[in-house]
Amino acid sequence: MPADYTSTARALSLSTSPPLSSPTSEDGSYLPWRHLAPTGRRDSSSRSIRESNSLRHQVMNRINNASQRIIMTWRRMNFWQRIGAVLAAILANLLGIGFLVFTGKVFIWLKPVAEQWEHNPLVFFVLWLCVFFVSFPPLVGWSTFGTVAGYIFGVWKGWLLYASATVLGSTASFIVSRTILSKFVHRLMERDKRFAALALTLKYDGLKLLCMIRLCPLPYSVCNGAVSTFPTVHPLTYGLATAIITPKLLVPAFIGNRLRVLSEKGGEMSAGSKAVNICSIIITIAIGIFTGWYIYRRTLARAKELEAQEREGIRQSLEADHAAHRPHHAFFEDPEANIAATTLACDEEERIGFHDFDDDNVDLVLDDESGREISPKRTDGPYRDEFTDNDSDVFKDGDGTDGETYTLHTHVRQNPRS
């Protein structure tokens, strides 16, 4: 018998198909297509293909998600809302085109008077006020005024005007927006868990994250109003973050100065000098766009990381409180931060299965067939699965007779029906 098992195992281990041999030609040499590419090159090429496919997949996913959100929003609109949305889109496009045309005309109008206005303090003050007031949402033109400042006053003097008005204007806009939007902020804090999470992350990594937000290519005045809705951000912290990123404001001032040089001395400059000035403008714009895009990506990643840390801390606190059967206490002394943490705590309780009530803590009332209560007493507190010395154990007493009825806490005997 063991020999039969051994022979059977050997037979099963043999392959029924002939072994694959390397393809050869009639003279015994290997065919040309038999030679494979080196392993390292194949791995690197496959890795690059996977990365490109992953990037393409991410881009397509974002496009699909955005289009689906737009379609869903459009379907939820009624007739008049759709008309309003179409008119708003047309108006936005017209305003954008008009703004571009107006911006181009501004520098044509400034060319004859730029040299005269360069040393005029009144022009300096008026332009400073313009930069200050466009800090309030929904006004636009902040970047244009920065370029105009560089066009009229040069790089450094224009940057000084632009930076000082930006810091003070953004801080004032922040304070005013927070005052006006205070009720809206509290409603948003209590209902929107994403808003609450970002508000909580700004409390501990506020200055660094605010600087990253200020470096992002976001609409200036709208950004001032949006950040003001986060109650954990202090106005002075926001002003300090704006002051820290003021070197970024050298870009529009430098572009404005180069435009003036090209407009005034373009006829006298050689082709090489013109090319250098034009290339410097293009390179400066490209650096600004790339830096803004990179900072935007890093800002989103940092915000997600901080949100995960805050959620983990809140989750551990909830689990510890539930394990110890103690009520949840305030997460922070700051009331605004505590509101945000409470909103996240509710979301975490839903995720991990905790609720504000315990399904076992229910009061039971047993009635007989006539609808009369047969339990002579009811406890004021919730029901607990535990026995006292005055209560009887239903499993100890057995099934009992047909005339006996048991509640979970009290053994009640009924007289048999007559």
Curated annotation (Swiss-Prot):
- Gene Ontology biological process terms from the UniProt entry: mitotic spindle elongation; vesicle-mediated transport
Parts of the chain that traverse the membrane: 83-103, 122-142, 159-181, 236-256, 275-295
Q: Name one GO cellular component term.
A: Golgi membrane
Glycosylation-annotated residues: 65
Q: Which residues lie on this side of the membrane: Lumenal?
A: 1-82, 143-158, 257-274
Q: Which organism is it from?
A: Aspergillus terreus (strain NIH 2624 / FGSC A1156)
Keyword line? Glycoprotein, Golgi apparatus, Membrane, Transmembrane, Transmembrane helix
Entry's localization field: Golgi apparatus membrane
| Function description | Golgi membrane protein involved in vesicular trafficking and spindle migration.
Q: Which residues lie on this side of the membrane: Cytoplasmic?
A: 104-121, 182-235, 296-418
Q: What is known of its domains?
A: The VTT domain was previously called the SNARE-assoc domain. As there is no evidence that this domain associates with SNARE proteins, it was renamed as VMP1, TMEM41, and TVP38 (VTT) domain.
Q: Where is the composition biased (Low complexity)?
A: 1-25
* UniProt record similarity statement: Belongs to the TVP38/TMEM64 family.
Residues covered by region (Disordered): 1-51, 368-418
The protein's name: Golgi apparatus membrane protein tvp38
Main subcellular location of this protein, as a coarse class? Golgi
Q: Where is the composition biased (Basic and acidic residues)?
A: 40-51, 369-399
Q: Where is this region: VTT domain?
A: 150-259
Q: How does it sit in the membrane?
A: Multi-pass membrane protein
